[in-house]
Amino acid sequence: MQLISAKIDGQTCMPTIKNGLLTVEVPNAPFIWEAEVEISPETNTALEGLYMSGGMYCTQCEAEGFRKITFYPDRPDVMACFTVRIESKLPVLLSNGNPSAQGEGWVEWHDPWPKPAYLFALVAGNLVNHADRFTTQSGNNVDLNIWVRPGDEDKCSFGMEALKASMRWDEEEYHREYDLEIFNIVAVDDFNMGAMENKGLNIFNSSCVLASPETSTDSNFERIEAIIAHEYFHNWTGNRITCRDWFQLCLKEGLTVFRDSQFTADRRSASVKRINDVINLRGRQFREDN
């Protein structure tokens, strides 16, 4: 990442950069920080920050990937409302929150809810969507989209039904309604996490959201349902209510895993789910006991 220019309250400043850390003198009062940087997503092979996957731009910012996009105090306790403008010739341009304005070759997204930088997301590419709509208990209509590469549209139906079931279950069991006008899922082949709960724009490894009866097993379907539920449940346990620091990671993840386990138990067999959870704990959490 290369710093092109920096300003504080509109005045050019000269920060020092050492070992990737930027230091600059700041006023003793609130101020506006502006930075213009240059990055190279095409050569970003770490798959962290903003990178390119098969002609599509996408992001992965948990835990500290946002600092590879721009200079920012990307700690989970630093929360802000984001407005993002994307300019590109690519047909689909997505980010967090709700679309607020658009024109030829550009779109703006605004997320009204303060969030830490690890939940920032951006996707740009040649994608097609499987669309649906969900009506919350209070009567708000939410547009739902699963974005995929052309040719994968026929593998989205199960994932969409799992998403709607997760939204309804969270309303009925925890009284938590979705809080934006749109919810997007993007399937990415080269994604180094199973899935990521970015606010309003979940990014999934394709294997965790796409399925068809011809090529997927029963366990594939159950896994996809559980992962979609887990990432959606993070909207409240992790996104709106986040952790103070990364030593508290177990709080947001532990609570959300508990919630997705409850969801699977309600949707399928509670006894079988409990047995599988114990097998998983013994095999992964307590390997020394095997």
Feature annotation, model-predicted:
Residues 1-182, 207:
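Acidic/His-enriched low-complexity segments
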Residues 3, 9-11, 18-20, 109, ...:
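Hydrophobic alpha-helical and helix-loop surface patches within well-folded domains
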